A protein has these predicted regions:
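Active-site nucleotide/adenylate-binding loops and adjacent lid/helix of ATP-dependent enzymes
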Residues: 1-115, 133-136, 142-158
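Residue-identity detector for glutamine
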Residues: 2, 16, 65, 91, ...
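Short, surface-exposed, polar/charged, turn-prone segments marking secondary-structure boundaries
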Residues: 9-11, 35-38, 78-81, 121-124, ...
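Phosphate-binding core of ATP-grasp and ATP-grasp-like enzymes
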Residues: 56, 100-138, 158-171, 179-182, ...
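Residues in and immediately flanking transmembrane alpha helices
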Residues: 66, 131, 200-203
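C-terminal active-site "lid" helix and adjoining low-complexity regulatory extension at the edge
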Residues: 151, 166-168, 177-218
Length: 218
């Protein structure tokens, strides 16, 4: 890349801050309680539902089989499968407390299509945003939820971005609204890897990115 006169927007260390979920320690008060080893789940939580995933990826479209666990016993079975998964296993399997989110519909495999949004940031400045679930069938509830997201959700995401902008320049904040009306961080992603999900206009996104980087589009 350097030989081409270019540079990475995020360094390897900055990428690892996202990929290893080091961000969790900076945002633990605004996201789901998370345990990086299943054995660390406290006994007080072992009768409750958990969500299992890799540090970066998940099998969310196999929700009932490989992500949602009704209790610790079910989580242990799913963890075995995920540890043997070629994509998830090398990342390390984590467990998160299941918090019911505002849900618009479900897929055939049980995946909840929730009130979740993706926001891109560069150096703490908001670039673009859109609804997270590009595969939703009925957009009506999304449009009903949009005003509250743009008023409350974006303000919440901006606050989150301000807290971690010194750690990584280009990143995505995925946020969702719980059934009780609270906004939470679902996860962070490296902006160089995160998809536009069919809900963020590519031309507008790359124009904004180019402007903020001070570099013309090739």
């Amino acid at each position: 890349i350097q030989n081409l006169g270019s540079r990475l927007v995020n360094s390897t260390m900055e990428h690892q801050y996202i990929a290893n979920m080091d961000w969790y320690w900076d945002l633990s008060d605004v996201t789901f309680p998370t345990w990086f080893r299943l054995s660390d789940v406290p006994f007080s939580e072992r009768g409750s539902a958990l969500v299992l995933k890799g540090r970066t990826n998940s099998r969310k479209f196999e929700w009932n089989q490989k992500m949602f666990a009704r209790n610790f016993e079910a989580a242990s079975r799913i963890a075995v499968e995920l540890n043997n998964d070629g994509l998830i296993g090398p990342q390390g399997v984590i467990a998160r407390k299941y918090v019911p989110l505002e849900t618009f519909e479900h897929t055939l495999t049980g995946t909840p299509i929730t009130n979740e949004w993706r926001i891109f940031y560069l150096n703490g400045q908001r670039l673009a945003w859109g609804y997270y679930w590009g595969n939703i069938e009925d957009l009506a509830p999304v449009e009903r939820a949009r005003p509250a997201f743009e008023k409350e959700g974006l303000a919440f995401a901006d606050t989150v971005a301000g807290r971690i902008a010194s750690q990584v320049p280009f990143f995505v904040v995925d946020i969702a609204r719980t059934q009780e009306g609270q906004w939470l961080v679902v996860e962070l992603n490296d902006g160089c890897q995160a998809g536009l999900n069919g809900t963020i206009d590519p031309a507008s996104f790359y124009a904004a990115l180019s402007q903020h980087l001070g570099a013309p589009l090739a």
